[in-house]
Amino acid sequence: MRGNFLIFILFCSSLYSEVIDDPFEGFNRATFEFNESLDRNFLKPVAQAYSKTPKLIKKGVTNFFNNLEEVETSVNQLLQGKPLKAINDLSRFVINTTVGIAGVFDFASKIGLVRHEEDFDQTLALWGIPSGPYIMLPALGPSTVRDALSRPFTSFLSVTFHMTEADVNLVLK
């Protein structure tokens, strides 16, 4: 009797086992191995060297890159129907780019302008576009199909996408 019950339980549990399908499994596994190698051989040594950088300089670098994201965030706020947040984020960019010396200092936060993070993937999600399957992107890591397809638009909105060598030289002088 006990044996029949055990067989019955095993049979029932196999009926309801869920098969999780990864349509990009081969690509994802190969890309994961590539990313692991990239991390081990390049990114980890760079990160270890950067960890020795003084906190004040790290904060300035973080502020600089956060400032560059403000324009993209502002556009996505508009696309999501949040005009007041868009004005806030664009104001942050103008203030931090000018008074904050190219965004190295975050004066906008000091005067009460809150930092937001929005990207085109979030905009597409708000519009009802499903995320799609998981995908591992080379050098960028885990993502979804929606996020991966939103990245070119996000890059186009990035300030750095539109910078020329002359712009960089002007800033560095």
Predicted regions, residues:
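Sec-dependent signal peptide recognition
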Residues: 2-8
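Amphipathic, glycine/alanine/valine-rich membrane-attaching segments
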Residues: 18-173
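N-terminal signal peptide c-region/cleavage motif recognized by signal peptidases
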Residues: 12-17
